[in-house]
């Protein structure tokens, strides 16, 4: 049976110093437990609730900062692309291109990501079922992508809330070999904190353990040394100090 893998890092690139702190801990966890870890961070958060919210350093500077992490720590990289023109440049740096949930039906974006030859991780939209994800997968494969992952991150449940139907994990296994559980975005309260997203990080461990039972291969955690001071998604991010104990439970 394949060992679980971890995707983790801060929501957005805030500074080189933050990337160093998080990457060093992820490298330590990866080596200590012999678990594959992908370092994740976004160079641009293009879908923030408010126009005044921090978005990140942008494509060119952000990719250079991610490349520095890979050189220094040897961790494979994952980042998200929001527009088709970003895919080629990002694909030259990272190992996995991620398609945001809200954009998972955007054909041109999926095709552009597929054309890079890199693995594509498609996050399931908050308004789709696991069964619906056959079609984004088909778009990537028709465009030549050799490896596609799918990620569960919950579904819209009324206003400012999400609920996870864990049946989506085995459903998505019909279309791909690797299904990931996004344990931190699944506990979001979208737009529920007055112009920004809230969240309930105390439920992150339960999300991870339930997803393990349902057959998830990978586990996605946004993590930060001090989530209360994070510039994006703080309320749902896992404290970096708590990541090791949770990873141990998943192995």
Predicted regions and their residues:
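N-terminal amphipathic alpha-helix/helix-capping segment at the start of soluble metabolic enzymes
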Residues: 1-7, 64, 251
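Hydrophobic faces of well-ordered beta-strands that scaffold small-molecule active sites
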Residues: 6-9, 37-41, 77-79, 97-99, ...
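Glycine-rich, proline-tolerant flexible connector loops at the mouths of alpha/beta enzymes
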Residues: 6-18, 38-59, 223-233
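Active-site glycine- and acidic-residue-rich loops that bind
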Residues: 11-24, 123-134, 153-171, 189-208
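Alpha-helix-loop-beta-strand connector modules within alpha/beta enzyme cores
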Residues: 24-33, 52-78, 113-119, 169-180, ...
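N-terminal active-site wall of soluble small-molecule enzyme domains
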Residues: 41-100, 105-109
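Conserved anion-binding
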Residues: 45-49, 103-171, 175
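Active-site-adjacent loop and "lid" segments of alpha/beta metabolic enzymes
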Residues: 51-60, 98-103, 159-166, 186-213, ...
